[in-house]
Amino acid sequence: MSKHIHILGICGTFMGGIAVLAKQLGYKVTGSDANVYPPMSTQLEEQGIELIEGYDPSQLDPAPGMVIVGNAMSRGNPCIEYMLNRKLAYTSGPQWLSEHLLQHRYVIAASGTHGKTTTAAMVAWILEYAGLEPGFLIGGVPQNFTESARLGGGYFFVIEADEYDTAFFDKRSKFVHYQPNTLIMNNLEYDHADIFPNLSAIQRQFHHVVRTVPSNGLILMPDNVPALDEVIQQGCWTPLQCLGTEHNSHWQAKKLRDDASQFEVYCKGKLAGVVKWGLIGDHNLQNGMMAIAAAHYAGVELNQAIAGLGAFKTPKRRMEVKGEVQGIRVYDDFAHHPTAIATTLAGLRAAVGSERIIAVLEPRSNTMRMGTHQQALAQSLMQADDVLLYQPAGLDWNLQPVADELCVTNRSDSTNESGIDNSHKAAIHQHINDLISDITMRAKAQSGPCHVLIMSNGGFAGIHDKLLAEL
């Protein structure tokens, strides 16, 4: 078979990462996407990968040895129809990874509704810090590295394990293909309403991956998460270690600061050390503990894992500070699920105390656009002082009820247990320029520091740079 691989949908982070790995394995790699754009296009071209914009079937003539089909591709796409009609050899990204790379490596997979990218980046960095030169494929760009994917020089391979479906011809979750030796299950909630009818359907996929973890491997998960407990109750053939607050948990963390920027690490009830780092929030504490546990099982000494975590930098788009102008700090975060929104805001609130927080949200994920989480959205934003919602064209539901719920009129009845006033001023905008003007006005209207937290899993029309320029 020809060593030429052609990737359909190459500019996504996952498929672009596969392109980089295939190139490093010695394949000739080409690919196409509907829109070829930086930064992924730049990364790929620097690797010597030829990119084609659009899906004209001529790109498949002469036929490559293998077509790797991204999960965004569907029937009716000209390249897909040509590929099927000509009976070209094709596979999915996860299946190709399994057959050509993961079979020969010790795989550490980070799964869960939230925290996959950050946890995978933490594990990869701790292994790197320990001199183990791991390979990795991560859905964001870890700031401790210069790329989102690399082959690595060691035995270990760290992968962000996504439960989204594999391809138009394989509706199993991607992670079912990864053959993990160590599986991290961070959490589990209902998400991806476009492909999963209910939580049970997602749990079924999680149990499929649990079934593939060998008996000499490891499964890591938090205590007291009923949705994960139910997955394990369906059958588990692998040693299980849990993170929790109970003394009988294998792993425990004790916060030394409310914002979780310092915490003690306990293993089997014994103090192993203290993490002091630049991240905040209970969600990041849990991500970090999972990473320490996974790295320790891979052979990293606990003191070295703790030191490595202390030197970890959050991946881009995870509470990433984009800039600060006259005491107004602008953050970018990938949060797009009510739980992630709430935990991100709670972490920021713990860090900044009573300083003003303006939360800006674009409901862009498929699940959010369908309105699946609309009932929980207002509650998830309660830690912010101001909430500005972007109503993009094509959103299937109206954001006004969320804004109405946030606009509490009686200030005396709206203080939460932490003493933070939850009498919100919420607004909805349909145009980016109007949204930026409103953020600017609100941020400058108050004396003292202000924190603008922008949350979206998309580009949000470049709002961060535009806002900083306006400020």
Question: Which role does the model predict for each range below?
Answer:
Residues 1-36, 45-51, 62-67, 85-88, ...:
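ATP-dependent carboxylate-amine ligase
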Residues 2, 105-107, 260:
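Short coil/loop residues immediately preceding or within conserved phosphate-binding loops
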Residues 21-24, 45, 59-62, 71, ...:
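Phosphate-binding loop of NTP-binding sites
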Residues 32, 54, 93, 137, ...:
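Generic beta-sheet signal
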Residues 34-37, 55-57, 73-74, 223-227, ...:
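Short, polar loop motifs at secondary-structure junctions
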Residues 52-55, 93-98, 137-140, 236-258, ...:
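Beta-strand->loop->alpha-helix junctions that form or flank phosphate-binding loops
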Residues 255-271:
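Acidic-glycine-rich active-site phosphate/pyrophosphate-binding loop
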